[in-house]
């Protein structure tokens, strides 16, 4: 249910309501392309914070055996910052940026430790399907609350004449915080903390010292995880494009004149269409392999980025949104499960921390490039088409990954560990 709960942040805050609110209300005192650029820079900075912290905290969580506690801590930061978005009003773009930075830090940070639980609750044969079903649940849960929020925003003033025009949007931010918190509770009640496993010479040592030593050792021995590292580089490249499309599509559409109803309606459609396609990609991976399934999604994303350059009508946005829905969940779920198969289970939080570094630096580079091109050119059409370079390079590097060899390397590392209470 954590996918169901936290995905409300991804839909209402990251993708749909807040970007439009940032452009139309919080950033209404700025030029449209300036508001777009500052949203991109805000997204980049929040991702940078997580990228710096995630590997260290992941290593500490592995050593101490408390992944759930770290998950809860970051969730608390995210829920609190999201609730405080209620106080953002006209011209408050700086406050909106600060709260979004903390909200996204909490959201992304919690996912490091949530993802680290995946190899412990699913077998190697099940991990693609479990990850895909989790993403499907996320799309449905996030989409359901987004639908409720859209109804609130569209009909709130009609039902309650004379209210502040921004009130329903601000209440939607509060609803995300409540939804996220409530649907996180089953995880903390029913999922057990994984067994703590450490190296023989680490027992009784200082957690911070051990964690830094582990990180240093991992960097030194990264050649031993050649396929895992190669995949992380590939992921970094193609995730630049995917993440930027997710976070910048709505504000891009707003800039080129697509109506708010179309923007939010399309994103709502994406949530429900993406759910069955995420499950379908899990099944496809079982038939043709995880790597080939990711290839397919990246080819489609390349076509989407090209199509985005020519976007001018509302139906174009709907069509591109449907194409995104076909591949968004599958590409993310299979990437998450593939790294889970090629990492040592005893160091899952540490390696998902590294995964988060590559993911967050992709969230830095992509939106930053988008904002930079938009600033230099005065509009954002070239920004969207420039994303194809990330997909093409990602596919080239992905072709160098030997999945079976990577899985065997992870198993050999786990065999060196001892179990402690």
Report each predicted region and the residues it spans.
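Helix-loop boundary and gating motifs at the non-cytosolic
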Residues: 1-47, 227-266
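A membrane-interface helix-boundary motif in multi-pass transporters
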Residues: 32-33, 153-178, 372-391
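Helix-to-loop junctions at the C-terminal end of transmembrane segments
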Residues: 52-66, 276-290, 374
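Structural signature of the two symmetry-related core transmembrane helices
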Residues: 69-84, 292-307
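Hydrophobic core of transmembrane alpha-helices in multi-pass small-molecule transporters
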Residues: 81, 92-110, 316-330
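Multi-pass alpha-helical transporter architecture, strongest
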Residues: 87, 179-190, 385-420
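Intracellular juxtamembrane helix-capping segments at the cytosolic ends
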Residues: 109-122, 330-343
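Juxtamembrane intracellular "pre-TM" segments in multi-pass secondary transporters
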Residues: 192-232
